[in-house]
Amino acid sequence: MEKTIDEIDFEKSGGLVPVIVQDANTKNVLTLAYTNKESLELAKKTGNSWFWSRSRNKLWMKGEESGNTQKIKEILVDCDSDAIIYLVEPSGPACHTGENVCFHNSLEK
């Protein structure tokens, strides 16, 4: 079933919904970010990963500074319409540390 942006429940978490970013080819989870309605509209319009930066309090496109962009192949919405997956083709590392994925640390036992 296809959903519209207006069906996404942005109000449940104060205007933001989590976005899991996953490599469309390898299926590796690259990162977790957040989107608001405006950044999701930009992602749909441009085909690039757009997010809302909670730390900088502004819109940002992945790769706008690093060049490591993510081309969106598909956007999936969960059953409650309060979480999203971007299936992407990354052009470089997803993590600002230079790692391919942001989930490269293990929690101590």
Regions found by a protein language model. Give the residues of each.
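C-terminal binding/interaction regions
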Residues: 2-16, 22-30, 35-109
